[in-house]
């Protein structure tokens, strides 16, 4: 009887949801709740340095927006900055026009303008808002949303919102530029680099060679150095007003730009009661992984004799932050150890796991997703759900099937807050009595050596209190998205194709879209779908949870599915901001007419943001030579300028254009200029050059070229970090003249020229190094390398 009640209620809710998406405005005369958010640039100090940030109503994070289910939200967003901005309401079901993705669904908010967002509140739970313009979220444009249900289903006395974030004192665009140039500085700065001396000490040379063979420096699981991780804008924050015995609903949101966290609690183990705004069957769980953009609610009991420490630990162990609930002595949270990156490399080597799938493949229009999946990564099903294991993966050609007349009634998204008859109190108490050690254990852990490497990153502990599955008769469209990336050039994509080189993923209303997310990288990827909740298929089958964001662990896979009940275009992307801005995104489209209010705001502007040019340079100022290198690069195109001047007055310069065919191979052409006599600038020789540049296995940079005098040249270079901050490098070049154009000396069949150098470098900072080298042209010397 209860199941029939919930099914009928679900049908009613979704029918209303579809209608409300088409008809905007407060047509039902709901009570109005109104806010004004003002975004401006201000000087802030979050990590010991005063820098420019972006505030919402004068603070970072912005204010908590509170609503009650059944209200009508009107939010005025005022832009007092000199650049455009936007606000996305993360996890909120609302009309497409107000979703807040500039140039896709919503106009950008230009400097000095105010945009009014308005939508009915049809759900309850913990959510958040943030800018969707470039990297503004990293600078501070984010805040939380709390929506109270019409009738509470949980028992607690008070509540607390904890917004997690990461903070950099650099300009976010400079951070991305540093990543694009392939710098290892962030790994060095936070102590997570794996130089050769540590690899040798651990007996992991074979594992390191295996990574190098696959063109990977190491098991990098986080990109960026952060001087501070924050909870509600502070590295440590106290909440002493909670009294002993009180039950507190702690609403946690990971609003970080690129950091997922492990969460641990001191005192009595908490009860996890909600995920991404949806109630789940309460489970006692202390150590919990929260991916970027996810939200989890816990019920914690304030102890009689102390205060609870809530601690977050960055996924790579590079930092922590704490909040304290209550007063008295500290009940410390368990410490999460730093990941063993060298140990990870060793385990993966034993598994003979193939990595290095292209982030930028040769033919972006060719469908090779199954080939990619079969060739790279973990060749096994990591899911615990038998239904997932039985899925047929051979019919993914996006066939269109007839929609059964009654399937629309059963294939809809759930609004958990409407289920007022659901009695969670008893389940909550039962969970409190459960044994936390058993609840936290990893079920079904693989016994083969190395196979448990990422087994703790799963959602099996999340179970919906009601069935979430769709009608068995509903047509299903299956999509495979391999998550691919390249750390050297910092390009992130799906199926080897970044956003700028792909078309929209078209879906239809009235069908189930099932997406398998197959991660072929060493990074976590929290994937967020705008405007929808999807089922995360886990061991709970029909009771799999509903979420708006799902974390896909390194070399693992997750399957999600959702019922098509919306209209318009919706963004689907990795919520690591720097990955999204580097191409790991798609547009999910119902292929409906574009809103006329978006005229003048082409979606090409959004796409272009992921294919920008980034430029950088370096100057070597040494006693025996001086060199300059300048680079400007986007996804496929790169321009290079280099000049070198030796102590013997040998001057050489070169300008080239490169076209990347895929991650590791590019063709190039350009002009080389060199003074004909080493000690004279009277005459210069100019030659045209064409060739290929290739990143070989084991990370050697190969340059093979020929000039307009038909003289071939080959060059090979490599750098290796031996100790933290300390690297060795070498370069070899061989040029041959067979006399095809030039006259050779008497009795010579050919002439050749060899250039080689070797040296060491010590990094003082991100931008300055001291170096010493020997060059067979210039001799030995030393000096500074300055990067900009």
Label the model's feature ranges:
Residues 1-22:
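Bacterial Sec-dependent N-terminal signal peptides
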Residues 271-272, 277, 494, 503-504, ...:
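Intrinsic, low-complexity N-terminal interaction/targeting segments
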Residues 618-627, 643-653, 673-686, 696, ...:
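Solvent-exposed loop/turn segments connecting transmembrane beta-strands
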Residues 35-36, 481, 605-626, 634-643, ...:
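Transmembrane beta-strand segments of Gram-negative outer membrane beta-barrel proteins
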Residues 21-292, 298-299, 329-363, 373, ...:
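Histidine-centered copper-binding motifs that mark active-site loops
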Residues 690, 757-761, 777-788:
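Outer-membrane beta-barrel "beta-signal"
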Residues 127, 570, 626, 635-640, ...:
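Repeated loop/turn-to-beta-strand initiation elements of outer-membrane beta-barrel proteins
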């Amino acid at each position: 009887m209860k199941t029939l009640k919930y099914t009928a209620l679900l049908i009613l809710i979704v029918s209303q949801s579809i209608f409300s998406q088409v008809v905007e405005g407060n047509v039902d005369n709901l009570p109005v709740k109104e806010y004004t958010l003002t975004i401006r640039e201000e000087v802030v100090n979050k990590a010991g340095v005063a820098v420019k940030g972006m505030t919402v109503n004068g603070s970072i994070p912005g204010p908590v927006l509170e609503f009650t289910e059944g209200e009508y939200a009107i939010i005025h967003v005022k832009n007092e900055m000199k650049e455009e901005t936007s606000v996305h309401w993360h996890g909120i079901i609302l009309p497409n026009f107000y979703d807040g993705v500039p140039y896709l669904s919503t106009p950008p908010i230009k400097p000095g303008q105010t945009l009014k967002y308005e939508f009915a509140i049809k759900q309850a739970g913990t959510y958040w808002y943030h800018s969707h313009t470039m990297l503004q979220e990293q600078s501070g444009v984010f805040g939380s949303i709390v929506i109270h249900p019409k009738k509470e289903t949980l028992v607690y006395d008070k509540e607390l919102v904890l917004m997690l974030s990461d903070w950099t004192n650099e300009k976010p665009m400079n951070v991305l530029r540093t990543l694009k140039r392939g710098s290892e500085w962030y790994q060095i700065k936070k102590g997570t680099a794996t130089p050769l001396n540590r690899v040798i000490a651990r007996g992991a040379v074979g594992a390191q060679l295996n990574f190098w063979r696959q063109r990977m420096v190491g098991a990098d699981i986080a990109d960026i150095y952060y001087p501070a991780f924050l909870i509600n804008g502070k590295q440590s924050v106290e909440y002493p007003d909670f009294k002993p015995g009180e039950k507190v609903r702690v609403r946690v949101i990971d609003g970080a730009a690129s950091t997922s966290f492990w969460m641990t609690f001191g005192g009595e183990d908490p009860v996890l009661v909600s995920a991404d705004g949806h109630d789940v069957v309460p489970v006692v769980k202390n150590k919990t992984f929260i991916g970027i953009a996810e939200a989890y609610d816990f019920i914690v009991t304030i102890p009689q004799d102390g205060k609870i420490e809530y601690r977050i630990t960055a996924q790579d162990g590079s930092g922590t932050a704490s909040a304290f609930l209550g007063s008295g002595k500290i009940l410390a949270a368990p410490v999460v150890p730093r990941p063993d990156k060298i140990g990870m490399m060793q385990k993966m080597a034993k598994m003979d796991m193939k990595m290095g799938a292209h982030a930028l493949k040769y033919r972006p229009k060719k469908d090779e997703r199954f080939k990619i999946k079969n060739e790279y990564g973990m060749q096994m099903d990591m899911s615990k759900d038998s239904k997932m294991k039985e899925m047929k993966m051979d019919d993914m050609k996006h066939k269109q099937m007839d929609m059964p007349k009654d399937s629309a009634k059963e294939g809809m998204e759930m609004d958990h807050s409407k289920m007022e008859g659901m009695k969670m109190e008893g389940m909550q108490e039962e969970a409190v009595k459960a044994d936390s050690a058993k609840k936290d254990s990893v079920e079904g852990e693989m016994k083969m050596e190395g196979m448990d490497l990422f087994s703790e990153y799963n959602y099996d502990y999340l179970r919906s209190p009601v069935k979430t599955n769709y009608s068995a008769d509903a047509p299903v469209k299956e999509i495979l998205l391999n998550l691919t990336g390249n750390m050297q050039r910092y390009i992130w994509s799906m199926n080897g194709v970044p956003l700028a080189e792909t078309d929209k993923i078209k879906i239809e209303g009235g069908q189930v879209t099932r997406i398998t997310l197959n991660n072929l990288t060493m990074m976590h990827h929290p994937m967020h779908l705008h405007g929808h909740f999807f089922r995360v298929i886990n061991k709970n089958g029909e009771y799999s949870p509903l979420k708006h964001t799902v974390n896909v662990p390194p070399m693992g896979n997750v399957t999600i599915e959702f019922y098509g009940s919306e209209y318009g275009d919706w963004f689907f992307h990795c919520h690591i901001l720097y990955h999204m801005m580097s191409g790991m995104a798609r547009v999910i489209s119902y292929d409906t007419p574009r809103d006329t209010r978006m005229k003048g705001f082409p979606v090409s502007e959004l796409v272009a943001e992921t294919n920008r040019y980034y430029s950088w340079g370096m100057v070597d100022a040494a006693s025996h030579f001086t060199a300059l290198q300048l680079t400007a690069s986007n996804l496929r195109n790169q321009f290079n300028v280099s000049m070198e001047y030796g102590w013997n007055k040998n001057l050489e310069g070169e300008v080239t254009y490169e076209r990347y065919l895929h991650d590791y191979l590019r063709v190039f052409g350009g002009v080389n200029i060199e003074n004909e006599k080493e000690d004279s600038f009277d005459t210069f020789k100019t030659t045209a050059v064409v060739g290929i540049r290739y990143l070989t296995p084991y990370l050697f940079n190969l340059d093979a070229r020929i000039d307009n005098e038909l003289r071939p040249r080959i060059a090979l270079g490599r750098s290796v970090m031996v100790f933290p901050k300390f690297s060795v490098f070498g370069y070899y070049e061989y040029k041959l003249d067979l006399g095809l154009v030039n006259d050779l000396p008497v009795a010579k069949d050919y002439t050749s020229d060899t250039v080689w150098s070797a040296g060491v470098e010590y990094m003082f900072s991100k931008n300055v190094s001291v170096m010493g080298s020997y060059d067979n042209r210039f001799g030995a010397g030393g000096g500074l390398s300055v990067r900009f």
